[in-house]
Design a protein with these regions (language model features):
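Hydrophobic alpha-helical segments of polytopic membrane proteins
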Residues: 1-3, 107-110, 147, 165
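A membrane-periplasm/extracellular boundary helix in multi-pass inner-membrane enzymes
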Residues: 1-22, 40-45
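Long extracytoplasmic/lumenal interhelical loops at the membrane interface
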Residues: 21-90
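Short, flexible micro-motifs
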Residues: 54-56, 94-97, 140
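A short hydrophobic/aromatic micro-motif that marks alpha-helical segments and, especially, helix-coil
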Residues: 60, 66-68, 104-108, 146-147, ...
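Hydrophobic transmembrane alpha-helices and their immediate junctions
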Residues: 86-126
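Transmembrane alpha-helices of multi-pass inner-membrane enzymes
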Residues: 101, 118-130, 134-165
């Protein structure tokens, strides 16, 4: 299985088809299909500002014309992208608040420490969450946000390794 994994091929597998971004990689294409369905449907249904809320599974995951979105056990309700999930649940305003919160954390760090080294911890966590359900679960968000709190609270005591001298 590991011999078949070709990351470079997947990265260059994206193309436009009938106005939609698609991929020759089945997993990437499956996720792109869900994400685009969520965003397009929100614009079509006028939910850009309010989102779907938190009381139900996204309609796109229940779409009978796209079997398999709920997974083999029928329990998969996540869209596998934290930004799309935030946008779909609470609309553009909630997505703005998410970005403003993280920008505030970064600016606080910058003002206290005069560098952007906190990005070494924030960016990888967010990138992973763009492609999987890490921040849509229970454990990872607790670890992530408690770590950020601890790191920011003790920023003057924490010695961050200087990477560039």
């Amino acid at each position: 299985l590991a011999d078949e994994k070709d990351t470079v091929r997947v990265i260059f597998s994206f193309y436009m088809h009938y106005g939609r971004l698609e991929s020759t990689d089945p997993t990437a294409n499956w996720r792109l299909d869900i994400w685009q369905d969520v965003v397009f449907d929100m614009f079509e249904d006028g939910l850009v500002f309010s989102g779907y809320g938190y009381n139900e599974i996204f309609p796109q995951m229940l779409d009978p014309t796209a079997p398999g979105r709920l997974g083999r056990d029928g329990m998969n309700e996540h869209v596998h992208n934290y930004f799309v999930n935030i946008f779909a649940r609470g609309g553009i305003f909630q997505l703005f608040l998410f970005f403003a919160f993280h920008l505030g954390l970064i600016m606080y760090w910058k003002n206290e420490n005069h560098n952007y080294q906190i990005l070494m911890y924030i960016i990888p966590s967010i990138v992973v969450s763009l492609l999987d359900i890490t921040l849509e679960g229970v454990q990872f968000p607790l670890i992530y946000y408690f770590f950020l709190y601890y790191f920011l609270k003790n920023s003057t005591k924490v010695k961050v390794i200087e990477l560039y001298g």
